[in-house]
C-alpha cells in the first residue's frame, strides 16, 4: 500500500544516514507502533530498545515484534539511561509533538555515543500546505513543523558536529505519480515532507 511505500522510503533514508557498525546498539525514542524499531533490526546486530510514553503503543509494539527487542515506558525529556548508553539514537516524528523540543533533543544527544538521527515534519513541503497549516488536520493536529534551517538550529549548543539534512516524500499520498517524482526531484531542494537530521556526537 501507499503507507508501506512511504515507510520504506523513510526507512531507506534512516539506514543510509545511520550507517550502523557491527555490534552497535540502538535506542528508538517515541517508537509508537515499533515500525522503525522492527525495521532497523536487520541492520543493527547489537541491543535495540524502543521507548515510548504511551503504554498502549508499547503493548502494540511488543505484540508485533518477534525479535529480542526491549520496549520500555519512558519520557523523551528524561530518559532512564546513562550518558552515551547507546551507540545510535533515533526519534522519528516525535520531537514535533513535544512542547519542550530542545530538552528532548538534548536528552537524545546525552544518551548517544556516536550518532543521533531525528525525523521531523518539513514546513517547506506540499504536505504542510495540505495538512499542517493552522492547528493542523487529522494526525498532524498540534504538530510543530520545521524548516531545514530550524531543524539544524535545534542542535545549537549541543556537543555534535557533521550535521546533515535529508528529505523524502515530495508528493504526499504515495501514489504512482508520487513514486515517479520521488527519484527525479533534486535532493538539494529539501522539499520532502519527511525531514531527517543526522548528527555525530562529539567525543565518540
Where are these regions (language model features)?
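Short catalytic micro-motifs in class I SAM-dependent methyltransferases
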Residues: 93-96
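Short alpha-helix
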Residues: 142-165
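A conserved beta-strand element that flanks and buttresses the S-adenosyl-L-methionine
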Residues: 90
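A C-terminal cap/extension of S-adenosyl-L-methionine-dependent methyltransferases
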Residues: 163-204
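Class I SAM-dependent methyltransferase SAM/SAH-binding core
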Residues: 27, 33-78
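Conserved class I S-adenosyl-L-methionine
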Residues: 1-21, 35, 39, 115-142, 175-176, ...
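A short glycine-rich, Lys/Arg-flanked "PGG" loop and its adjoining helix->strand segment in the class I
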Residues: 102-116
Amino acid at each position: 500500500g501507499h503507507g508501506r511505500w512511504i515507510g520504506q522510503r523513510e526507512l531507506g533514508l534512516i539506514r543510509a544516514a545511520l550507517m550502523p557498525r557491527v555490534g552497535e546498539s540502538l535506542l528508538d525514542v517515541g517508537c509508537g507502533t515499533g515500525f522503525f524499531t522492527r525495521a532497523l533490526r536487520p541492520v543493527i546486530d547489537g541491543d535495540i530498545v524502543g521507548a515510548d510514553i504511551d503504554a498502549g503503543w508499547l503493548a502494540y509494539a511488543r505484540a508485533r515484534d518477534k525479535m529480542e527487542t526491549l520496549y520500555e515506558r519512558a519520557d523523551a525529556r528524561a530518559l532512564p539511561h546513562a550518558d552515551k548508553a547507546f551507540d545510535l539514537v533515533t526519534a522519528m516524528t516525535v520531537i514535533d509533538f513535544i512542547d519542550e523540543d530542545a530538552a528532548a533533543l538534548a536528552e537524545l544527544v546525552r544518551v548517544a555515543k556516536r550518532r543521533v538521527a531525528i525525523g521531523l515534519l518539513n514546513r517547506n513541503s506540499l504536505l504542510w500546505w495540505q495538512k499542517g497549516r493552522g492547528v493542523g488536520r487529522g494526525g498532524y493536529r498540534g504538530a510543530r513543523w520545521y524548516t531545514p534551517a530550524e531543524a539544524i538550529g535545534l542542535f545549537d549548543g549541543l556537543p555534535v558536529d557533521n550535521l546533515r539534512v535529508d528529505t523524502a516524500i515530495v508528493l504526499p499520498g504515495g501514489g504512482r505519480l508520487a513514486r515517479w517524482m520521488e527519484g527525479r526531484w533534486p535532493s538539494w531542494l529539501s522539499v520532502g515532507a519527511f525531514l531527517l537530521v543526522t548528527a555525530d556526537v562529539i567525543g565518540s
